[in-house]
């Protein structure tokens, strides 16, 4: 087992016990930071979202918030942890997602993200298009 995978598993095991953290059947963890009132997207919808992505040590790897530009994202064209979460969210929701590596980029990684890495995202669902 890689160091990244072990660190992610240890982090997620501890995180799952924290107040307000919900764990889904897939292993995705989330915490509702703010509740919205709007529409919930389906798998073929496109959403406008802001996000802030960090490693479990808090280091930022990508952030639409820092760029000041929300992104249009196809619900079924993002990592599977996001696809699952977005379909449970409503417009106006802000959630913190704790994504196991198998629901993120898996063993291959991508760009600055090594393989087998658990990731944390703060996601604001702005609009279902």
Spans of model-derived segments:
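Cross-family detector of peptidyl-prolyl cis-trans isomerase
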Residues: 1-129
């Amino acid at each position: 087992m890689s160091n990244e995978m072990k660190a992610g598993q240890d982090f997620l095991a501890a995180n799952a016990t924290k107040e307000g953290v919900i764990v889904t059947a897939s292993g995705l963890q989330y915490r509702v930071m703010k509740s919205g009132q709007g529409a919930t997207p389906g798998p073929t919808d496109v959403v406008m979202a802001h996000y802030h992505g960090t490693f479990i040590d808090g280091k930022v790897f990508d952030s639409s918030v820092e760029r000041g530009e929300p992104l249009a994202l196809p619900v079924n064209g993002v990592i599977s942890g996001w696809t699952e979460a977005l379909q449970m969210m409503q417009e106006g929701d802000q959630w913190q997602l704790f994504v196991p590596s198998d629901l993120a980029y898996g063993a291959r990684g991508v760009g600055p993200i090594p393989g087998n890495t658990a990731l944390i995202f703060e996601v604001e669902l702005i609009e279902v298009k």
